[in-house]
A protein has these predicted regions:
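Bacterial N-terminal signal peptides
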Residues: 8-18
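Surface-exposed extracytoplasmic segments
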Residues: 22-249
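Bacterial N-terminal signal peptides that target proteins for export
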Residues: 1-9
Length: 249
């Protein structure tokens, strides 16, 4: 199967960290006509910030699959098996790749006789490290490439992506879902930390007004966030900050 490649670029220079999204035929929050036909490959936003629990680490978040309505059916929201999601790091400020992280996903079907996303309340089996009653689980692998030498190494494989939020009967309360999602957090060799799964979309915008010829006059009660309550699929990569800057500066 020929994989499509989606790029998220993090450029770091000695003067500071600059972050800019760069994608192959993708744009922000589905306003570009072509990528609207391929939401699994739509890179909505890219964020980078100092880890709240460790000032020596930087968290990079690349979001995909915009406008995930929790009531819209979980079958439609996932990472694409035919997409190679990539984060490129320029840590010298020369506009060239030096480190590339590639995330590749695989979806399996537990019971092919049903179309159901889950066949009962989704739980987690600590002994087998698998989610229970989830009929469409996703796993992924992470490959790190040194673009200077051309060498690549798989730094994580058969990693779990958590199930989507379906509802109280399927994924339990918000607290229960939080515990389910935490099972999909990983620390990998080299000090990398990763998570890939559904999250609340943090982007704030009056998109209704934007698409209505920049009509913001109706916002009489203050700012309007048309993305409130919507989710995205996030690829989260935490790295030692020294990897993002020239000479560790």
């Amino acid at each position: 199967m020929r994989k499509r490649v989606l790029l998220a670029v993090v450029a770091a220079a000695a003067t500071g960290l600059t972050v800019a999204p760069l994608t192959a035929s993708a744009s922000s929050h589905r306003e570009a006509p072509l990528i609207a036909e391929d939401p699994l490959a739509d890179n909505t936003d890219l964020y980078a910030f100092v880890a709240p629990d460790d000032p020596n680490r930087t968290v990079i978040v690349a979001n995909y699959v915009p406008f995930e309505n929790p009531a819209g059916g979980p079958n439609f929201y996932r990472f694409g098996d035919d997409v190679a999601y990539q984060i490129h790091i320029d840590n010298r400020g020369d506009a060239r790749d030096h480190l590339v992280f590639t995330f590749q996903f695989h979806t399996s079907t537990v019971d092919a006789s049903t179309f159901l996303y889950n066949t009962g309340p989704i739980g987690f089996n600590n002994a087998t490290r698998t989610y229970t009653n989830w009929n469409r689980p996703q796993t992924y692998r992470v490959t790190m490439t040194n673009a200077d030498t051309g060498s690549s190494a798989v730094i994580g494989s058969n990693l779990l992506s958590p199930p989507d939020v379906v509802g109280d009967r399927s994924t339990g309360s918000a607290q229960n879902y939080h515990m389910l999602a935490r099972k999909a957090e990983y620390t990998l060799p080299g000090g990398f930390k990763v998570f890939a799964g559904q999250r609340d979309d943090p982007f704030f915008a009056n998109l209704g007004g934007v698409f209505d010829l920049l009509n913001f006059s109706g916002a009489t009660t203050g700012a309007e966030d048309y993305l409130a309550g919507m989710n995205v699929h996030s690829i989260v990569l935490s790295v030692p900050s020294g990897m993002l800057t020239a000479n560790g500066d």
